[in-house]
């Protein structure tokens, strides 16, 4: 095919060159000669076939191939298909009428005579669409009238039988046709108004007596009685399915095995009487699983409902993409600002690192200045007019969310429970453990004694050494910041530094293990606590509302999401034995190094 098309293109080029050379219009440009390709090909075809009359009457040299009025025929290589109408219009309907006969094809539920039609039609009639609609309505009205007559006849027979009068003395009409049409017109109007006209449009089974009457009315004189016995055998074979084995199948006597089919079980002992354990049919066994069918049905309905919901959601989402957000959608956006952590010059180089290395800040914890006298809290806390900004750090933004809806109720339910993060969302943990105030932890603990401070410790504190916690806390305790404690005057700086040095050698997680946000599990807790009890004796000073170490994954997740868990359980045995609130003891005791 490609060679044939190429040959046609070559012929077109040769014809174009011959026609262009014989043209007498020397003023035609190259563009005009290129446009004359299609007319020249038409001229060559017209001269060969002699089918174009106007082109034969005009001499070739006098034609203007570049004229816009010149005829441009369609290409012989590419022709557009002629559009055909896609709709089908019916002009009329032809109805063929067939006489009734005994069918011998169907199997009715009762009786022995079946209805059929003759192989040749007896009449033919053509209707227009409007006429056929009217004929259908008339036929339905007639069927409904006949049904009403049958119902009326049955009602009269029931009344006579209830009264005890014999049918011969009652004088009832012998057939439906004997009932007058005028007597059922009122009932017919009521039935049409009630919507019963649509009922007659569906095929209804006729009883055996009605079928015999229709056959006799159609001219059938003799009804074959042999069909009745054949139909009875067919119905019996359909009802008699499955084997008649009693719980145990014998392949030699089982009807299913002899027929080469599987035993079937829809429910107990139907259609086959064998059980699952006693079936020995070599062809196998098929059981109806009702649970599987119901599960498939439920899954299908669920899938269809999900598809409908997804389609409706896409329909609702499509017009909403180009529209501006509504005021209700804007109200869903949180209006509170996210807390911005301090810069590295305030926290130090190790404040936000993730290498988990220890950084000792005990030497610089005492060189800090106290806050303003008018500020009752820690000087590092932001004032009332502080507006926190938005930081790109996603972890800081996640940890800065507050949980005001849960914390208030938990504080009212139990005293000393783990508080919410509302009181901790306005400052950074470095303000607690920072080096600017020696009594920062103690003063903050005293001012926030109503709730636990451990739930608000963020992830940035994992890199701080335990010495800053003890040093700041002990020095604050000497100033009387912690209520209910006292420092003996005989305690000097040397003992304090010795305690600090002995505690600074341990891992920071040993003290943070008691906190819910840094719980590493009961195994790590028991191992570390047993090691630390042999070498160090922790100071006795009360801390408000410490939470027991819970699950590591749940505590870490709750610390990220900002949800606080109530301290409903008792403290760790280590905390119970070391931190006692009942007996006031000295804050510090000499520890052997």
Curated annotation (Swiss-Prot):
A Pfam family recorded for this sequence: CSRNP_N
MF terms (GO), sorted A to Z: DNA-binding transcription factor activity, RNA polymerase II-specific; sequence-specific DNA binding
Record region (Disordered): 1-66, 313-392, 478-497
This protein's record includes keyword Nucleus: yes
Sequence similarity: Belongs to the AXUD1 family.
Descriptive protein name: Cysteine/serine-rich nuclear protein 1
GO annotation terms (biological process): apoptotic process
Main localization of the protein described in the UniProt heading: nucleus
Presence of keyword Nucleotidyltransferase: no
Protein keywords: Activator, Apoptosis, DNA-binding, Nucleus, Transcription, Transcription regulation
Function: Binds to the consensus sequence 5'-AGAGTG-3' and has transcriptional activator activity. May have a tumor-suppressor function. May play a role in apoptosis.
Subcellular location: Nucleus
CC annotations in GO: nucleus
Entry superkingdom: Eukaryota
InterPro entries documented for this protein: CSRNP_N, Cys/Ser-rich_nuc_prot
Low complexity biased stretches: 17-46, 351-372
């Amino acid at each position: 095919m490609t060679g044939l098309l190429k040959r046609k293109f070559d012929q077109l080029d040769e014809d174009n060159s011959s026609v262009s050379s014989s043209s007498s219009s020397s003023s035609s440009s190259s563009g005009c000669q290129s446009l004359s390709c299609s007319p020249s090909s038409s001229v060559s075809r017209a001269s060969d076939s002699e089918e174009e009359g106007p082109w034969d009457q005009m001499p070739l040299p006098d034609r203007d191939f570049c004229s816009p009025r010149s005829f441009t025929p369609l290409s012989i290589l590419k022709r557009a298909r002629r559009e055909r109408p896609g709709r089908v219009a019916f002009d009329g309907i032809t109805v063929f009428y067939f006489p009734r006969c005994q069918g011998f094809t169907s199997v009715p539920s009762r009786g022995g005579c079946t209805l059929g039609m003759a192989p040749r039609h007896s009449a033919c009639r053509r209707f227009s669409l409007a006429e056929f609609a009217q004929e259908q309505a008339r036929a339905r009205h007639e069927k409904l009238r006949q049904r009403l007559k049958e119902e009326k006849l049955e009602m009269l027979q029931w009344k006579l039988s209830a009264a005890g009068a014999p049918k011969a003395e009652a004088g009832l009409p012998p057939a439906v046709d004997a009932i007058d049409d005028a007597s059922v017109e009122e009932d017919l109007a009521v039935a049409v108004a009630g919507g019963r006209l649509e009922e007659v449009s569906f095929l209804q089974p006729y009883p055996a007596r009605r079928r015999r009457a229709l056959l006799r009315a159609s001219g059938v004189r003799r009804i074959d009685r042999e069909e009745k016995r054949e139909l009875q055998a067919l119905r019996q074979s359909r009802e008699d399915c499955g084997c008649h084995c009693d719980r145990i199948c014998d392949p030699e006597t089982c009807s299913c095995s002899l027929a080469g089919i599987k035993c079937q079980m829809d429910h107990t002992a139907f259609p086959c009487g064998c059980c699952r354990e006693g079936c020995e049919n070599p062809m196998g066994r098929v059981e109806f699983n009702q649970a599987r069918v119901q599960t498939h049905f439920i899954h299908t309905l669920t899938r269809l409902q999900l598809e409908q919901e997804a389609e409706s959601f896409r329909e609702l989402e499509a017009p909403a993409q180009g529209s501006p957000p509504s005021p209700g959608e804007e109200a869903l956006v949180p209006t509170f600002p996210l807390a911005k952590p301090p810069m590295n010059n305030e926290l130090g180089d190790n404040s936000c690192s993730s290498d988990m290395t220890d950084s000792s800040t005990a030497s610089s914890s005492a060189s800090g200045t106290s806050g303003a006298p008018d500020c009752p809290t820690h000087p590092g806390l932001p004032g009332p007019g502080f507006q926190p900004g938005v930081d790109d750090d996603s972890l800081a933004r996640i940890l800065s969310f507050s949980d005001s809806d849960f914390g208030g109720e938990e504080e009212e339910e139990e005293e000393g429970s783990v508080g919410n993060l509302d009181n901790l969302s306005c400052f950074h943990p470095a303000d607690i453990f920072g080096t600017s105030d020696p009594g920062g932890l103690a003063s903050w603990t005293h001012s926030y004694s109503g709730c636990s401070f451990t739930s608000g410790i963020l992830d940035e504190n994992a890199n701080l050494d335990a010495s800053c916690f003890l040093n700041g806390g002990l020095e604050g305790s000497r100033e009387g910041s912690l209520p209910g404690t006292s420092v003996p005057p005989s305690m000097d700086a040397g003992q304090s530094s010795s305690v600090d040095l002995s505690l600074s050698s341990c891992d920071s997680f040993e003290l943070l293990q008691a906190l819910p946000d840094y719980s590493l599990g009961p195994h790590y807790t028991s191992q570390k606590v047993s090691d630390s009890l042999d070498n160090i004796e922790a100071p006795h000073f009360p801390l408000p509302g410490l939470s027991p170490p819970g699950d590591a994954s749940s505590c870490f997740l709750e610390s990220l999401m900002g949800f606080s868990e109530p301290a409903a359980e008792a403290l760790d045995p280590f905390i119970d034995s070391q931190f006692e609130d009942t007996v006031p003891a000295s804050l510090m005791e000499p520890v052997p190094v």
